Amino acid sequence: TPKKSGSLVLNCLNCGALYEYQYETDCHKKGQRMSELSRLKPDPIPTIHPIPEYAADAALTAIYERTKSGFGVPWMGVVAMAFAHYREFYNCLWQAMEPVVVTQAFADACQKLRFAAEKEAASLSPVAICSKLTKLGYDDREIEEIKNCNEVFSSGNMPYVLMATLARLLLEEHSWDGKGSAQTHDAPSITFKRPVLIELHHADPNTTALFTDIRQTLGLPFVNTDYRAFARWPSYFNPAWTDLRSIILREEYEHAVLRVHEAAVLLAGSLPNMSKITPQQLIGCATQDGQLSEVLSVVRLFQWLLPGLAVNVAVFRRQLV
């Protein structure tokens, strides 16, 4: 099978450095390269059945703790909890990922993916809102708390994006032949506490209406953890969402998200396959959980929405500069 190679240049907003990511992927057996994995929203949107941490049995709780520790995050993303409904599938996927998340290649991929999201967010020119927050009475300490909450997701979403992307690649029968370095490093420390979340039954009518608008604007039947965390500060989140909503409705927004999707596909495909998992192995485990088409539809849903979520959180971050 012929090889394809190229490079993706990502601009680091925070440090001004320029990163060049060299990738190499095999052609798919049907002629589709990993780098050409389309951005695909399933239709109809599948019903998800996330297993929250409090409802997990002992075995699943252990996997959840290893997931959070491996990713260096203080919360289980909805994506992982939805995948965990398909127990054999998630066990197989995590067993393949666990030795990868401690590699330098994985840490670098997360960093580069974040830089890609932040570059796209900057190109969308979000409105700065710190002066508005100050006029509302927010002091520097409170604004810093919002920034810290954002940092949880700005950094923590990236492992979940890569996990969903790898899951889709394998379920769609792409070989995982990444050439990234298998050199290991210490697992990332969890530096932030799990954010306080505003659940639907906590929300007053205004916040309930905001959550409804988020679902309708994004075309999703649920509200991601990130938005429920930011809703802790309603007078901040209302103007932040209003600006983001106007950005989402612009044509260039989808182009920006597509570029982050493409970066995720390239970066995920470059990771070293430490366990040598094959598409057939993950497909076999997913089949044990029921209909393969159902599992694939759920995986496609999250692999579609997470690049957009990464851009949205980066927009929120840019608003606070």
Model-derived segments and spans:
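Accessible peptide chain termini
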Residues: 1-3, 34
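Serine residues within intrinsically disordered or low-complexity segments
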Residues: 5-7
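Cysteine-centered motifs
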Residues: 12-15, 27
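Hydrophobic alpha-helical segments
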Residues: 31-321
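Cys/His-rich microdomains that often coordinate metals
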Residues: 19
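Short beta-strand element of the conserved SAM-dependent methyltransferase core
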Residues: 10-12, 316
